[in-house]
Amino acid sequence: MFTRTAAGLLLALFAGVAPAKDAALRPWPAGQPTPALQLADLDGQAWDLASLRGKVVVVNFWASWCGPCVDELPVLGRLSGRDGIVVVGVNYKEPLDTIERFTAAHPLQYTVLRDRTGEAFKRWTPGVMPTTIVVDQTGRARWRTVGEIPPDDTRLRAAIDALLAPQADRQHNQK
């Protein structure tokens, strides 16, 4: 009885977590509109995805208890340092003090938003963490990775570079 209960609890705990070997970059589902994303940051300031039109935005859904989420932090940190890209981490339903302790131990170079109710997670993801979405300069979701982004992943970088290329060409032609 105990073994069956323990196994059930472990299954429930890890059912929504995907390691890197399971991650795959895929186009945003055809016909599925890009949901709005309006949440508060850790200081309680309102934040709206629509305000970032003109930039490529990488939206990452995570939680401090999610091992693959923690493992992919260096990849997201590298992306956040690139011109023309904004990385936003959306924390799933954790208390503010938990998020603050986590970000103190793992300094993030990007904005963290709070999804207190889990509604944004439901609208943006297939229910698996981590999930990372690439939004183009017009505000349209283009790509989604379900599961941990591997440290050596070239597909996500190439997809972002392809979105940035037309912008770089326009800037070069204006000079």
Residue ranges and their predicted role:
Residues 20-49:
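N-terminal "domain-start" segment that seeds a small globular fold
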Residues 70-106, 116-122:
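Structural microenvironment flanking redox-active thiols in thiol-disulfide oxidoreductases
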Residues 34-35, 57, 129-131:
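Short loop/turn microsegments at loop-to-beta-strand junctions
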Residues 5-16:
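Bacterial N-terminal signal peptides
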Residues 101-109, 116-164:
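Thiol/disulfide oxidoreductase modules built on the thioredoxin-like
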